[in-house]
Structures are given as C-alpha cells and as structure tokens.
C-alpha cells in the first residue's frame, strides 16, 4: 500500500468515525413551554368541588406526569394564594416529575426548559397533588396542643386540563411525634424546633400516603 493510499484510507476512517459519533448523539425533542400555560390554567380553573368528580381507582393514578398545585401555578404564571396550604414543606418537590421541576427552576437553561416542556406535553395525563386544608397548629407554630391533620386531594386531569377523577388523601402527624410534641410543649409559646419537627413529620406522612396510591384498596 502506498503512503498516499494509506493517508487517504486513514482520512476516510476518521471521517466515518466522526459521522458515527455525530449520528449517535441524539437530540431530545423540544417544545415551547408557553404551550403548557393554557393547560395549567385550565387545570387550576377545573378544580372540582368536594364530591364533584368520580373517585380515581389505583390504576388511574399510575403513569402520568405529577406535580403539586404550587408547581402547577408556577408553570402557569399564576400567583399562589397565601396560606399554609401553599407552603413548600407541605408541597414537597419529591411529588413533581423531573420535567416539572426543571420548568420552575430559574437555573434551568432554555434548551432544557424546552425539552422538559416537550416531556410534559407528551404525558398521557396529569396528576396534581392539591392541599385543601392544613389543620396543624403546632406545626405552624401555634400552641394549640392537638394532633395535626392535613386535607388533600389527588386530581387526575386529561391533556387538555379537564378533570377526570379525584382521590381524597387525608393524613395526620404520626401519633408518636404528636404525643412527643405535646409533652415537650411546656412553654407559653410554641418552640420553633418542635414546630419544625412536626412539619418534617407531616411531610413524611404525606409521602408515605403517596407511595401507596397505586396499590389496590384494602378490603
């Protein structure tokens, strides 16, 4: 083989390798995040009254894009009403699909935002965790010595933002943590450290209930 032929063959191999490398780099599909805004606004508007929608079965709550009501409002650009129901500790980030988190993170670059928008728009349905009432005075720093209770619902919407079904999800502070807090609350005002412990406990109780959503109902 001549030197010229060897150089030519080497160049051909290098070009082929470059082509393979370029072709193997898949570009994730993108979509305009603005397309999500009317869907999110429709979902917020179509929040049903209690008893105003069918009850979701366990299998209806598996496979969609998930998010908290707070995240829904952030994506839609609508402000959240003030109150404990919209605070971060009871609207945990763990309940958001990664794509939803990326959309509301101010540090996300534009390409990633567009890829996240495409992913959400491709979801078969949306599952929204909505906190309706936080009756947990000790967790909120108020000295009212009773066990904390949170009323919430899991709302399934179709891809247009219309309600499909609802699952009521009410939960309480763990009895052990609640009793501990009552025993320790011997001051005139609520100890902020105890209140923080109770918020963490309610956060954990919520995640425990969420993990059980797709399981069959107990007889």
Q: Which role fits each region the language model picked out?
A:
Residues 167-169:
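Short hydrophobic alpha-helix segments
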Residues 35, 39-42, 116, 201, ...:
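Charge-rich, solvent-exposed alpha-helical interaction surfaces
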Residues 20-22:
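C-terminal motif of bacterial Sec signal peptides marking the signal peptidase cleavage site
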Residues 110-160:
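Surface-exposed short loop/turn segments
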Residues 2-12:
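Bacterial N-terminal signal peptides that target proteins for export
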Residues 174-219:
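C-terminal/domain-edge helix-coil "capping" segments
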Residues 24-107:
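A structural "domain/chain start" motif
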């Amino acid at each position: 083989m001549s030197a010229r032929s060897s150089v030519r063959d080497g160049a051909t191999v290098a070009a082929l390798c470059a082509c393979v490398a370029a072709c193997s780099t898949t570009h994730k599909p993108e979509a305009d995040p603005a397309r999500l805004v009317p869907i999110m606004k429709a979902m917020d508007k179509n929040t049903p009254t209690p008893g105003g929608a069918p009850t979701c079965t366990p299998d209806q709550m598996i496979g969609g894009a998930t998010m908290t009501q707070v995240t829904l409002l952030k994506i839609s650009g609508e402000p959240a009403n003030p109150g404990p129901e919209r605070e971060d500790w009871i609207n945990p980030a763990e309940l958001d699909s990664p794509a939803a988190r990326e959309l509301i993170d101010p540090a996300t670059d534009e390409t990633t935002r567009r890829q996240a928008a495409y992913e959400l728009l491709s979801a078969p349905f949306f599952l929204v965790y909505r906190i309706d009432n936080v009756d947990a005075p000790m967790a909120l720093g108020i000295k009212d010595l009773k066990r904390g209770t949170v009323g919430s619902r899991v709302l399934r919407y179709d891809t247009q933002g219309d309600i499909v079904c609802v699952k009521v999800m009410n939960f309480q502070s763990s009895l052990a943590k609640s009793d501990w807090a009552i025993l320790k609350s011997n001051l005139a005002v609520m100890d902020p450290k105890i209140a923080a412990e109770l918020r963490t406990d309610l956060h954990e109780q919520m995640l425990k209930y969420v993990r059980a959503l797709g399981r069959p109902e107990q007889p």
